[in-house]
């Protein structure tokens, strides 16, 4: 039987820990191995996602059922807040493990507001390269909001398979 011991920390100290965690998570998400075109190695990405799944199961299952995670997709910011909240509530993990949990959840269970998303959000949720993410944002600036997936397919230079793999993540609200 696993017994989790929690220490009651002052509110300012918990806030400091959560702030540090959010910064560490942000660095962990953006500091991905890339080549000169902003492309990540697909094998490295797959390995990171496998490791993320394992760490997520370990860290999250000590407090709740894993099914609780998958009730609602969340944006990059919402996963930031969720993981920071987990840390302040006593979830046991290193900052690197929290960053990996957040990266995994954002990538596999993220929600992407296509018409307002930043390049960072496109990369985090869909696994796009920096170049692909920038092309989408520039196209959106030049042509206006995307009505649906078909409109997004008009953007040249995208790996359409990456978009199709995460159709449920795409939100086209106006």
Residue ranges and their predicted role:
Residues 99-108, 157-174:
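Alpha-helical interaction/regulatory segments in DNA maintenance proteins
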Residues 12-26:
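Bacterial N-terminal signal peptides
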Residues 1-11:
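N-terminal secretory signal peptides that target proteins for export/translocation
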Residues 49, 65-91:
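Gly/Gly-Pro-rich "capping" loops immediately C-terminal to redox-active cysteine motifs
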Residues 88-98, 124-126:
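Electron-transfer interface patches adjacent to heme c in soluble/periplasmic c-type cytochromes
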Residues 29-55, 110, 116-118:
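Electrostatic cytochrome c docking/interface patches
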Residues 56-67, 101, 105:
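The canonical Cys-X-X-Cys-His
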Residues 64-66, 125, 129-147:
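Amphipathic, charged-and-aliphatic alpha-helical interface segments
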């Amino acid at each position: 039987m696993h017994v989790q011991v929690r220490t009651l920390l002052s509110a300012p100290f918990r806030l400091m820990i959560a702030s540090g965690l959010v910064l560490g998570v942000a660095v962990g998400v953006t500091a991905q191995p890339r080549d000169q075109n902003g492309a990540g190695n697909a094998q490295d990405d797959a390995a990171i996602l496998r490791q993320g799944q394992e760490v997520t199961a370990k860290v999250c299952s000590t407090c709740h059922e894993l099914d609780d995670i998958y009730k609602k997709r969340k944006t990059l910011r919402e996963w930031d807040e969720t993981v920071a909240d987990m840390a302040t509530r006593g979830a046991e993990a290193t900052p690197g493990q929290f960053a990996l949990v957040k990266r995994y959840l954002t990538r596999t269970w993220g929600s992407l507001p296509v018409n307002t998303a930043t390049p960072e959000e496109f990369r985090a949720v869909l696994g796009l390269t920096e170049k692909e993410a920038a092309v989408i944002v520039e196209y959106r600036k030049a042509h206006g909001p995307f009505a649906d997936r078909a409109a997004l397919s008009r953007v040249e230079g995208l790996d359409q398979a990456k978009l199709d793999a995460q159709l449920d993540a795409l939100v086209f609200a106006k």
